[in-house]
């Protein structure tokens, strides 16, 4: 054995210490400049209130903090403070704990603390399907709350979920019938057999604002927790919300709209009789999305003779038998944290003489890469690349210009126009500028025109009017083809978007969208120029744009704003197009977003735009297997070529 191999090696250097993880973000101490402002009030807005099991104390929320108060009124004592938003407090039936909703963990979740405000801890730790409106089971061991589910619209719908007070992922109790009609405000019956909640039961699956509250928007549902039977329990004109069972199990308080007023009612659970108690409530939220409840939570006193509720800025107690209302005075004195507004340190001119044009639309580079065209301020502009000056493509001022696209030889540009009175046209103009020639046969709603590779045909999309637009010339929407010099157009497909050509002039690629309740099916399809032989090539739920390269070897697509490129497969089954696809190699080419995807004439470079910047990337910079690719592929470009311009501001004169 060589002696050098037998030597004792020197001690290895200790591994470098891993960098310390950044501290968790604290809602109550976010690190922003803040100030404390005094708070001294005897009224509040949208306050949920609960009565302690012994009936001697109230707990309520006000401006994101929780307070206790003697039931007769007086000075309120803060249980929680800070920037976190705490709300909807509920005493446990054993009187030892308070459950509440808080965003102190970053989003609305269920929390528990001792009755004196100490030892607060989260019961749930959802980061997306957030929770609110906790209600205790009679044994004080479980909570039921509204869990939030969103889909295609922003606010979504609720389900009732059961959680042990120690935590866990929860048990689903109800299933939302769709993703837009809400449900919430859960409440246990005192024996624990039933769960009441309010639900929007208006017809259809689509939420609509401005529904008629004099009809029936919400009903109170009752879920039998033993048999799982669900039944509409309180129904009728004016709707029914905020179910609140009495401790003796004989009554159910709720809120109903009576003409223009929100009215407190009580229902006898034996006879079914419903009796109005008080018509001075604040307006409930039946006509809108009410993910935190249609009316603030209220509570019975332990003897089931009185209700405590919020209305007109005050806490009130009503004797159910006599309907006599007694205010419960409260005084909250403390502070609130205000954070400094975000603003630019530099003064901004309100009306500058000139302003930068940043909103460039339908940016398209010529096939040779020597010129770019785009729409700005309602008209088309061209600019020589890389450093030319933008100039108007036409000189007309009678209509707006949109959707420009170069011919494959770069000599012509096809585009669409719009006029509020005369509607729209498809036109062709020299890439050097001039007067556009109309090639469409009649006025209409035209979008996304494109030349065939041989320059003889133009495909475009015709849509329809209605709603805010006139309904004329709207009977036959779809994809059309017309000769470059005009003539009678021919419909290729009754639907489709973004028509364009690949290598040949005999086949048109387009995006086909089939709407679904939860997600769309968004397919790359093609059809012969004679309207026959339809094919489906790619499918996705998220892709908003497909663009086939001129040689038909590649496809670019936009998914969740960013741009991606993949080889375009031939034959076989329809391939799923996705940034996470495993069927074919996929590369992200944009860093922030990739709008208006299009290819160079030789299919070696992809272009896109973001605001006033033009970006591009060669395929050899995106895939290591492309000829000429560097050993290490570059990251997506951070900065593009500025192609916008300064425009004189339209400054008003006079007084």
Briefly describe each language-model feature range:
Residues 51-54, 301-303, 366-368, 549-551, ...:
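Loop/turn segments within WD40 beta-propeller blades
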Residues 47-81, 86-87:
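N-terminal, post-signal-peptide region of Sec/Tat-exported proteins
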Residues 4-6:
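Boundary at the C-terminal end of the N-terminal hydrophobic targeting segment
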Residues 45-48, 186, 289-303, 346-364, ...:
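Signature of short aromatic-glycine-proline-rich micro-motifs recurring in repeat-based ectodomains
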Residues 42, 61-67, 82-86, 93, ...:
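A flexible loop/linker signature enriched in serine peptidases of the S9 family
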Residues 22-46, 76, 340-358, 581-589, ...:
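A short helix->beta-strand "capping" segment at the edge of beta-propeller domains
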Residues 50, 90, 135, 187, ...:
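Conserved beta-strand position repeated across blades of beta-propeller domains
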